[in-house]
Amino acid sequence: MRFPEFLKEHGTIGFVAPSFGCATEPYYTAFAHARERFGQMGYHTQMGPNCLVDKGIGISNDPALCGKELNESYCGTENDVIISCGGGELMCEVVPYIDFAGIAQAKPKWYMGFSDNTNFTFLSATIADTAAVYGPCAAAFGMEPWHPAVQDALDLLCGKITRVHNYDLWEKESVKDEEHPLAPYHVTEPVELKVFPQGAENVTMEGRLIGGCMDCLVNLLGTRFDHVKEFQERYKDCLLYPSPSPRDRG
């Protein structure tokens, strides 16, 4: 399996919008502040043509144009890693326009996004045999202050950490809105890990973690993009994680 190089000091972070872009508030201001933060940290940023566009239905633009943006950004040399602008609802319409054969031949890059971006992060692994990150989208990096999960996401792209873990609290209701675009995660609920079957102790497992948003995974079942069986036959160590659909698209 192909694992991309980590983001280096003064490297370039690219942004694409194969699902929602950051054309409206609170995402517009949060995305602008995220780019400012990255610049202060010494990174360069590069935006695809759809990042600030709101012409599509459930996505930033026409599906063909969204696919073109993703293909060119991934296969091009203008950036070193890619972070999606946001989640959404209809990235499934972009999937037929993604050149997975070209991506499999291109130099691998870390791609990070969540929710609707399962349509790329999951298929990047199962079709193009290239690892990707199910993690926060671009606007999240505009929050003040950064939640540890946001810092960990960047550190993961940079290779500064090689392990991920739970946090003490999770967000049930976001307080980010048009008047508070830089609000951090509103974490109020304690994390509770439940093991099934009940009563089991010291559960450990090892394998290759793949998965994503449940809605997206269900939509891919049985289509020409469903290569899970072949992926399982190649590696025989798959651990599937389903994620509920988050309400916050960014």
Residue locations for each model-derived region?
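Short, acidic/small-residue loops that bind anionic groups at enzyme active sites
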Residues: 100-123, 131-138
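Conserved anion/nucleotide-ligand pocket segment
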Residues: 137-215
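ATP/NTP phosphate-donor binding region
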Residues: 1-78
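Oxyanion-binding "anion nests"
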Residues: 210, 216-240
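Gly/Ser/Thr-rich loops at beta-strand to alpha-helix junctions
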Residues: 20-23, 86-91, 115-119
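Short Gly/Thr/Asp-enriched flexible loops that form oxyanion-binding sites at enzyme active sites
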Residues: 87-103, 124
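Conserved small/polar residues in nucleotide/adenosyl-binding loops
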Residues: 241-248
